């Protein structure tokens, strides 16, 4: 049943969009001649539901401050059967961007759309797809992507995705693309200042006239700076082609605002300051350039009205770590990104914001560097991280005054701090409510941050390999800051899944610049391993990953180098034993370094290390495709070579590997079970 036109008008007003209502099909009534040069960022659509979708373009004008465009939506690419026609304003106040909500559409239907100015100068033609009805039993297909730093590479993955989708059977074509953040990188390098990083060429993206410089990075501090970056990114032809082919469903990660920022604090390396106005500017630019059903701060249809804020210190926090300073609250609430999408019978997608409401980084105190130290190449004792994550609530409210590593003792910097939260109290309550209300076969949590533990077992290192011994029976963590080390919060969520008997729970995420597949579990051995769902991380589209950094930065004389890299003959890429370390442990790595015998190395796998992992590739790039049915969830990783230069091939270039992870729907009380199969290529040490 379609919503009424009156209800549709209220929805359009709530999300700050112009609107059009579909009617009977008729021929086009406008003059139109394609002039892509006048629409330099292309066209896009976003957040489809069963009867509507948001359309977007940017058409800058040299004269005046406000102009009108016409948008048409048709059932055919030739616009013989036009079902919607409306005028929409573009203005200098919105950087000449347009958002149009088209309603009255048919469910699970493909449409074509285009924009035109008063002189008949037209945009390229875009294609979009509405969602199926909530009771539609058809299979759901979508892709999830993240981390597209075109300052340091090219978007060959999108071209591969388009090439394959155009040739896929209709029932297997993608319905939408879920973008899990780092759509832009606010840390911009200039090619005339730094020509390369690692083995990558630095490409021109934007110039930040009003920003701040940290090292080689230029960082925006105003909306004009963020807009310049979006315009530079959206000049990429492969990104334009992808946005013109599918509706995108997007949520920001950190780089849409600030690299190491949280709430409205700007932080990039040594640069840290209150950034309430910067957070508002980042939200405004995101709102202007990504079509999404997100709530703006004003009731206007045409623009984001930024709330007046001042950059003042945030000194008072509530019991959950939320800064109570009024400008901070105004800034982080200037745009609410968390939302849901129902897509047929088989998908309830719940999307969360991992940066606007999170507490301060609980692992950043400099004194903690003494725990493990540089000798262990970034390994940090898991028990110590759990103490820090738990804050004042650790051990039933009795956290230790000190944290120990062998004979080293440091004061517990989180003893009086709240337990770490990534979601914040209000959003977490909303998320838990949505999870319990979800009725689709699969309840998929779309969040930008990975949730699978990244740990190793240095307690099994041979005696004497390092100057200091690692504590017995103590696992190590190799990253922090995402849900992989947010034990308190994720346990709360996973316990809800188990206690509410929720089946078909799965997480899709990004940010880590690597491929991961495994299980959502609150604890790992020696705790009780009880997975309640599936968990996947998609690799970066472009951005450099862990292995690329280690190839250039890992000390060559470290006795622990074989745990991460095994060097080969000159000119050949090293073997990435870091994948083995996370999946199988130090004994497997050292055996592989000695013998190059992968089967023998796997025979030494530590069964208590990573029962939650089925696959990990810290050197992967590409995208993931998901297929959901009544019976199973199928997640396919498509990995491409490092996208350092643009491929000249229509298919985006070669594939490194294609691997699929399949799980049948489980009943309440049962454990989910993944089956992994390599369809083509070589996954190396990832399994």
Task: Go through the PLM ranges and name each one.
Residues 3, 23-100, 104-687:
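Long, structured stretches of catalytic cores involved in phosphate-ester chemistry, encompassing
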Residues 7-28:
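N-terminal export signals
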